[in-house]
């Protein structure tokens, strides 16, 4: 029996059969865990792995590739390491580590992976951003030109900070470094009050290797001061792994960059980068990288430079947003010439140097005006401050120098005695209690009064009270002059200000 085969019919049947065939082919690169030790996994088989790539283990644990050798890769574990064992598979994701960013994170405390730590529920973020982002290029930036008011007299008047600047806060332990950073955050409360959302300054506080009790106290302070509404805290505590502490500042920076890249403004505090360098050293030694000076790896400068270069004032073409960084470095016995301090000093745009000796004398904030500098902030300083604070830094530096000679008990001429007396009064005038920030217009009035000789006949011990009384009188009777300075950023009517000052002098005498 013959069978007629119609070729076209067969072709039609085959076409119909494969028409709805939609089998997709997935390619995966899977490696095998060779060893697990101290939060570091050595794996083989990931031949095309990339540096800083996210990898996933069977139970959902996340790792980050931090070392690529000829026949294996080094992976740091970012989650629980207990469930990972020798022989487990590890899978490439071909993507970078991403974290949630946006306004939904304001008022929250999170870990470096974006998980909430405050018990206030899940975070539904506006967007996700990679932790590692390339810093803006030269053409994407513009020079710093807007002031960032900290509310701290000695900083706003003598060591001004501009939006988009990197200003280092450096000093020994217990000298008030964190207090300066917190006061800078708290001062934005009143500034933000009457501004639209896109003009407000948002804040990110990154706690690296801090005790959880310390961070809880910081959070409570910010809540009491009404500052948590515009602040996010990123916490990698002292009990967290070295890799978590290493990632924390990069995660915080990505959160800050969301505001910067959307035409808004953000202030980020890294507290502190000394502990960050120690965490990176620990991680690098576990990855068998060769140690260098003080056992830090050779690229320890790069980990801080690539982080701090992400702070910038963006060009008008890119929205004119800004990210201002206040990194903190803890020194040992005032040694600013150590490895990490000199690295960060060379990266930043200036430093605020805090001294134990001044702190112990009761000068708070304990800022050494002679050693502190702001390399770009003066361009952002408002004209009113330039009018009153031009000579103060020099006078204070001369006072510190003369004070050393005066201790020898030598007979001093009248000019030197006058310089010492004025220096003491200026130092007293610049003292400030923590969390008692001053608006810029009131700082201008105080310095104008000092220049006009308002405090000349007042004893050093009475300077603080006299300054409070003066500001109280201005708030009560001369609010219009304060508002004029605030709005115009310049002392427009010198005669009226001098007249008001004389009136206060008579009233408070």
Curated annotation (Swiss-Prot):
Q: Which domain of life is it from?
A: Bacteria
**Keywords for the protein's UniProt record, in alphabetical order:** ATP synthesis, ATP-binding, Cell inner membrane, Cell membrane, CF(1), Hydrogen ion transport, Ion transport, Membrane, Nucleotide-binding, Translocase, Transport
Q: Which residues bind ATP?
A: 171-178
CDD domains tied to this protein:
ATP-synt_F1_alpha_C, ATP-synt_F1_alpha_N, F1-ATPase_alpha_CD
Q: Which Pfam families match?
A: ATP-synt_ab, ATP-synt_ab_C, ATP-synt_ab_N
Its cellular-component GO annotations read: plasma membrane; proton-transporting ATP synthase complex
InterPro entries attached to this UniProt entry: ATP_synth_asu-like_sf (IPR023366), ATP_synth_asu_C (IPR000793), ATP_synth_asu_C_sf (IPR038376), ATP_synth_F1_a_nt-bd_dom (IPR033732), ATP_synth_F1_asu (IPR005294), ATPase_a/bsu_AS (IPR020003), ATPase_F1/V1/A1_a/bsu_N (IPR004100), ATPase_F1/V1/A1_a/bsu_N_sf (IPR036121)
Annotated membrane topology is: Peripheral membrane protein
Q: What does the record give as EC number?
A: 7.1.2.2
As for subcellular location, the record says: Cell inner membrane
Please tell me whether the keyword Secreted is annotated for this protein: no
Q: What is its main location?
A: membrane
What Gene3D superfamilies does the record point to? 2.40.30.20, ATP synthase alpha/beta chain, C-terminal domain (1.20.150.20), P-loop containing nucleotide triphosphate hydrolases (3.40.50.300)
Task: State whether it acts alone or in a complex, and with which partners, per the record.
Answer: F-type ATPases have 2 components, CF(1) - the catalytic core - and CF(0) - the membrane proton channel. CF(1) has five subunits: alpha(3), beta(3), gamma(1), delta(1), epsilon(1). CF(0) has three main subunits: a(1), b(2) and c(9-12). The alpha and beta chains form an alternating ring which encloses part of the gamma chain. CF(1) is attached to CF(0) by a central stalk formed by the gamma and epsilon chains, while a peripheral stalk is formed by the delta and b chains.
What HAMAP family has UniProt attached to this entry? Answer: ATP_synth_alpha_bact (MF_01346)
Q: What is this protein called?
A: ATP synthase subunit alpha
| Organism name | Neorickettsia sennetsu (strain ATCC VR-367 / Miyayama) (Ehrlichia sennetsu)
Q: Its gene? A: atpA
């Amino acid at each position: 029996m013959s069978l007629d085969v119609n070729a076209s019919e067969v072709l039609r049947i085959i076409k119909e059969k494969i028409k709805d065939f939609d089998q997709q082919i997935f390619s995966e690169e899977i490696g095998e865990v060779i060893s697990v030790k101290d939060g570091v996994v050595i794996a083989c088989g990931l031949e095309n792995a990339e540096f800083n790539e996210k990898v996933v283990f069977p139970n959902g644990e996340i790792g980050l590739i931090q070392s690529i050798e000829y026949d294996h890769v080094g992976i740091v574990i970012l989650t629980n390491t207990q469930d990972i064992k020798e022989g487990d598979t590890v899978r490439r994701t071909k993507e970078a580590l991403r974290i949630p960013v946006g306004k939904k994170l304001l008022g929250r405390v999170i870990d470096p992976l974006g998980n909430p730590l405050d018990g206030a529920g899940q975070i539904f973020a506006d967007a996700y951003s990679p932790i590692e982002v390339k810093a803006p290029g030269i053409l994407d930036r513009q020079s710093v030109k807007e002031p960032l008011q900290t509310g701290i007299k000695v900083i706003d008047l003598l060591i001004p900070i501009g939006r988009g600047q990197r200003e280092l806060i450096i000093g020994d332990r217990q000298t008030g470094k964190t207090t300066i950073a917190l006061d800078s955050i708290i001062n934005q409360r009143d500034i933000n009050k009457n501004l639209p959302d896109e003009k407000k300054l948002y804040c990110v506080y990154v706690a690296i290797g801090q005790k959880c009790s310390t961070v809880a106290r910081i959070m409570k302070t910010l809540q009491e001061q009404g500052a948590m509404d515009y602040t996010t805290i990123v916490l990698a505590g002292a009990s967290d792994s070295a890799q978590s502490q290493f990632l924390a500042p990069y995660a915080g920076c990505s959160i800050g960059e969301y505001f910067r890249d959307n035409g808004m403004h953000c202030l980020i505090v890294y507290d502190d980068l000394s502990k960050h360098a120690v965490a990176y050293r620990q991680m690098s030694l576990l990855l068998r990288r060769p140690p260098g000076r003080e056992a830090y790896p050779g690229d320890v400068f790069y980990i801080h430079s690539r982080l701090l270069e992400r702070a910038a004032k963006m060009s008008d073409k890119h929205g004119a947003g800004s990210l201002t960084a206040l990194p903190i470095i803890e020194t040992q016995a005032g040694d600013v010439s150590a490895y990490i301090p000199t690295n960060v000093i060379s990266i930043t745009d200036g430093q605020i140097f805090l001294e134990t000796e001044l702190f112990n004398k009761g000068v708070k904030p304990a800022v050494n005006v002679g050693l502190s500098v702001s390399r770009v902030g003066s361009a952002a300083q408002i004209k009113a401050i330039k009018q009153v604070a031009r000579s103060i830094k020099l006078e204070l530096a001369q006072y510190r120098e003369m004070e050393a000679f005066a201790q020898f008990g030598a007979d001093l001429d009248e000019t030197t005695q006058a310089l010492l007396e004025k220096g003491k009064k200026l130092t007293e005038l610049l003292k400030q209690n923590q969390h008692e920030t001053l608006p810029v217009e009131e700082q201008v009035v105080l310095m104008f009064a000092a220049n006009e000789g308002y405090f000349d006949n007042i004893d050093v011990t009475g300077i603080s009270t006299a300054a409070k009384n003066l500001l109280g009188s201005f708030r009560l009777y001369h609010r219009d002059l304060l508002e004029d300075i605030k709005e115009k950023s310049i002392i427009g009517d010198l005669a009226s200000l001098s007249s008001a000052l004389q009136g206060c002098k008579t009233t408070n005498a």
